[in-house]
């Protein structure tokens, strides 16, 4: 591996495990949080957009409640998460403000990202936060997400967020140096995997299942997260969060840990996802000007360029975009239902609120959710 993929990444999702943000599981390690915030602020100064998926809420809640060990009952874990999330967010906001940045709390469940409408809402919110130079602090909504507490895989959440915002890479920071050919705690001659293709079945065999006592994620969840992130063309780096200035060194191109590369470029992966894996629910017929705006200028699709709406679809579903002759030129996730689209078709975006009584987005399809096919 000659250089880290983080060097050329513009948008990065960083997942920090429990052992890297807590004091041996006894509440938050504020010095550690300060180090992460300092590095993320430095990346922001370089023009990089960073989303932080941070563990630590349950561990902080356990400490605040005075419990001596992590409970097993789900309702007690949920209570600890609710208490600890307050401290986690307060700590991050306070620290980031010293770097003249704001933090934002975003609590998600896997179900939020499986539902198309909620997916678009989450995507729009995160995109806006990044445009405002706010650092989103993401965690699972443990208070309601029973299954997620039992699985405990913020690694998977990190991958889902990577897909959601089309990040260039996912950095999973752990208490191990990276992925080894075998569990180094059990096999003396196990060697570090410097680079491999995400999704290689051999990686899952290597992963084993060792995890720390503070969190609940082992190396296998990280391998599966890298595989998921690769679906949108994102590379993954799994490395030790104990390395000094690890994020900055990765951004400088230093190869640290295990780099799991995606086989497809982001655009190709996005094209395949939209073109092959989602059922079309309807269509939008465009005028010639809108066709040119999409094909030649890479613009978002505005309602003013729509001359007709076919089929029945809801917000967040996939529709075909066709020219006047019926030739499909693009596919995308629509911001409005078919009924809404018919009411605003041919009208400027400034008229959406007057027509519908609200305006979710100024575009019918944002260019980030649009793939031009011809």
From Swiss-Prot:
Chain residues that bind ATP: 15, 174-175, 216-222
InterPro entries membership: AceGlu_kinase-like_sf, Asp/Glu/Uridylate_kinase, G5K_ProB, Glu/AcGlu_kinase, Glu_5kinase, Glu_5kinase/COase_Synthase, Glutamate_5-kinase_CS, PUA
Top enzyme class: transferase
Keyword terms, alphabetized: Amino-acid biosynthesis, ATP-binding, Cytoplasm, Kinase, Nucleotide-binding, Proline biosynthesis, Transferase
CC terms in the record's Gene Ontology section: cytosol
Compartments (UniProt record): Cytoplasm
Binding residues for substrate: 55, 142, 154
GO BP term, pick one: L-proline biosynthetic process
Reaction catalysis annotation: L-glutamate + ATP = L-glutamyl 5-phosphate + ADP
Major subcellular site: cytoplasm
Listed EC numbers: 2.7.2.11
Location of the PUA domain: 281-359
Annotated GO MF terms: ATP binding; glutamate 5-kinase activity; RNA binding
Cross-referenced Pfam families: AA_kinase, PUA
Gene3D superfamilies xref list: Acetylglutamate kinase-like, PUA domain
Pathway of action: Amino-acid biosynthesis; L-proline biosynthesis; L-glutamate 5-semialdehyde from L-glutamate: step 1/2
Family from the record: Belongs to the glutamate 5-kinase family.
Function: Catalyzes the transfer of a phosphate group to glutamate to form L-glutamate 5-phosphate.
Protein name, per record: Glutamate 5-kinase
Species of origin: Thiobacillus denitrificans (strain ATCC 25259 / T1)
Upper taxonomic lineage: Bacteria, Pseudomonadati, Pseudomonadota, Betaproteobacteria, Nitrosomonadales
Gene name of this polypeptide: proB
